[in-house]
């Protein structure tokens, strides 16, 4: 298959809207593979970045699954071939590279940050993996520095028990995925319940919501000797109520080793050590996927293709998506 010169891509227009437009394909760098996108998945980052840091002309989207159609000059060292089914994530709404994003017919991806799709998994399922796996790796094993032994991947590799918060209707789901216990984050006693359940031994907290209420739950749940708190967004300073707890937040797109010229606190310099970690983490993640130890997120496959995606982003912005990931088929499987 010879890729065309033009493609459909979902971009931020000069009027500030999100629209499907005709656009050139991304230029392929030496270490990259060109993937024909079959399915994409939406993430909160897609909605937040487009709203808070929109870049005119940028291609949106991070999560994708598709088939390799071209290789860069140095990408053959990674044992990928034309026609391989792959998935992963890229830096969508990237001010450094307007021509590349997952919400397009073709996406350019570093070969060492790409995952091979196992035979038992379809494109819709695979499209949900990239951002979630990248965020888990950057959060737990890079920022919080939990121990990770590659040979134990898929077998409680960190030696820690996972306690989670969610809505009660998702309790069975998270427990089926390995959570030791689940608590209702709507409850005013949620933090205290977790602290009692863990006998005051909770040391690490990862806050996927990041507001004053979720931060208060995490701080109350952490044991009396203190611990470490990590959020997926900049945390409210007024929520830092315990000196014994060390707070931080993670921006996973630093793993691409590119400067991020957004406004503070999102502005970052290039970070080569984050890229090196990501390379090693994706190798571990691939082994876990191959062993069947990674289950794709519950997906909700929506209709509408490219034109339906803006509506899905609105659902995320309104907080109307719970316990599932919105997926769109954008090409025939």
UniProtKB/Swiss-Prot annotation:
Domain of life: Eukaryota
Keyword ATP-binding appears in the UniProt entry: no
Annotated substrate binding sites: 131-138, 252-256
Enzyme class, spelled out: oxidoreductase
Self-association and partners: Monomer.
Induction of expression: Expression is positively regulated by the aspyridones cluster specific transcription regulator apdR.
Encoding gene, per UniProt annotation: apdC
The protein, known as: Trans-enoyl reductase apdC
InterPro entries: ADH-like_N, GroES-like_sf, NAD(P)-bd_dom_sf, PKS_ER, Trans-enoyl_RdTase-like
EC number(s) given by UniProt: 1.-.-.-
Job of this protein: Trans-enoyl reductase; part of the gene cluster that mediates the biosynthesis of aspyridones. The polyketide-amino acid backbone preaspyridone A is first assembled by the PKS-NRPS hybrid apdA. The assembly of preaspyridone A is initiated by loading of malonyl-CoA onto apdA, followed by decarboxylation to yield the acetyl starter unit. The growing polyketide chain then elongates into a tetraketide. The adpA PKS module catalyzes three Claisen condensations, as well as beta-keto processing and methylation.
Family, per entry: Belongs to the zinc-containing alcohol dehydrogenase family.
Keyword terms: NADP, Nucleotide-binding, Oxidoreductase
Entry binding sites for NADP(+): 45-48, 167-170, 185, 232-233, 321-322
Molecular function (Gene Ontology), one example: oxidoreductase activity, acting on NAD(P)H
């Amino acid at each position: 298959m010879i890729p065309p010169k033009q493609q459909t891509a979902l971009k931020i227009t000069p009027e500030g809207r999100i629209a499907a437009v005709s656009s050139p394909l991304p230029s392929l760098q030496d270490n990259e593979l060109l993937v024909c996108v079959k399915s994409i998945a939406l993430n909160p980052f897609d909605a937040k970045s487009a709203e808070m840091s929109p870049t005119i002309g940028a291609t949106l989207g991070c999560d994708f699954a598709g088939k390799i159609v071209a290789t860069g000059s140095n990408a053959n060292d990674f044992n990928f071939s034309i026609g391989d089914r792959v998935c992963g994530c890229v830096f969508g709404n990237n001010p450094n590279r307007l021509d590349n994003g997952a919400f397009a017919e073709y996406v350019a991806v570093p070969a060492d940050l790409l995952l091979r799709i196992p035979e038992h998994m379809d494109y819709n399922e695979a499209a949900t993996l990239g951002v979630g796996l990248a965020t888990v790796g950057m959060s737990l094993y890079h920022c919080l520095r939990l121990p990770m032994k590659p040979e134990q991947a898929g077998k409680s590799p960190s030696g820690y028990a996972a306690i989670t918060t969610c809505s009660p209707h998702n309790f069975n789901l998270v427990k089926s995925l390995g959570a030791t216990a689940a608590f209702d984050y709507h409850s005013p006693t949620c933090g205290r319940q977790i602290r009692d359940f863990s006998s005051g031994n909770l040391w690490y907290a990862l806050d996927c919501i990041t507001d004053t209420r979720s931060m208060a739950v995490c701080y109350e749940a952490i044991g009396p000797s203190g611990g470490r708190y990590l959020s997926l967004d900049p945390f409210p300073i007024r929520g830092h109520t315990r000196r014994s707890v060390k707070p931080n937040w993670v921006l996973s797109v630093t793993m691409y080793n590119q400067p991020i010229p957004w406004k503070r606190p999102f502005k970052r310099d290039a970070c080569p050590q984050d890229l090196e970690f990501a390379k090693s983490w994706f190798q571990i993640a691939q082994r876990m996927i191959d062993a069947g130890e990674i289950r794709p997120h519950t997906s909700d496959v929506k209709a509408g293709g490219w034109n339906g995606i803006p509506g899905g982003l609105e659902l995320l912005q309104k907080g109307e998506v719970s316990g599932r990931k919105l997926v769109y088929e954008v090409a025939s499987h």
